[in-house]
């Protein structure tokens, strides 16, 4: 069994003013497990162990893709807290879109925007195959994005303005989201981080309905 634990700890709570919470009650953590089988019989002992230490939990079988592994700040040993924060985004396909259209925009276009316009140092995409627990809320995907600590308190740090990252990711953004070039052209004097924020916000609108 492989695992990764993400909890809403005291450090994450210090940035509660900037958190967007569309899910109630707000989850206090996420446990990622890599199992030989997610079938009920083989998963039962794990579900029992989780139930023993939580008030409530929901489980999902997902297909994980990791376009940007954490090579910059990997934990030095099992049990160490990973540097910074892990932002979790729960996605639902808007009624205005079909599944294939939504998946194509998210994975084959927005991926480059999400990584290239932000100070992300790790990026994971989890497409939900099915819920594995009773009455689990309906989600279509989960995104996990790791950010440096400074990003929790500064838009400038959040929307990464490092030139070395731009050199790699800007060409990919322009190729798979051409509208980014138009946004830059309309804001020639804006600081890079502000332009990145505009590109990110416009790209998100394509496949996410912001409440």
Walk through the language-model features, giving the residues of each.
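Macromolecular interaction modules
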Residues: 1-211
């Amino acid at each position: 069994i492989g695992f990764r634990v993400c909890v809403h700890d005291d450090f994450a709570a210090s940035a509660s003013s900037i958190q967007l919470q569309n899910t109630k009650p707000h989850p206090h953590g996420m446990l990622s497990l890599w199992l030989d089988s997610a079938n009920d019989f083989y998963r039962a002992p794990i579900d029992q162990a989780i139930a023993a230490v939580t008030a409530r939990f929901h489980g999902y079988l997902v297909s994980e893709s990791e376009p940007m592994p954490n090579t910059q700040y990997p934990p030095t040993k099992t049990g160490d807290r990973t540097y910074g924060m892990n932002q979790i985004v729960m996605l639902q396909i808007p009624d205005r879109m079909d599944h294939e259209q939504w998946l194509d925009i998210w994975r084959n276009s927005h991926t480059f925007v999400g990584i290239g316009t932000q100070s992300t140092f790790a990026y994971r995409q989890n497409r939900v195959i099915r819920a594995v627990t009773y009455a689990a809320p309906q989600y279509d995907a989960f995104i996990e994005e790791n950010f440096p600590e400074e990003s929790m308190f500064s838009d400038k740090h959040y929307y990464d303005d490092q030139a070395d990252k731009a050199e790699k990711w800007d060409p990919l953004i322009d190729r798979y989201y051409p509208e980014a070039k138009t946004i830059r052209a309309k804001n020639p004097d804006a600081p890079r981080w502000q332009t990145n924020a505009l590109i990110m916000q416009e790209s998100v609108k394509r496949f996410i309905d912001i409440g």
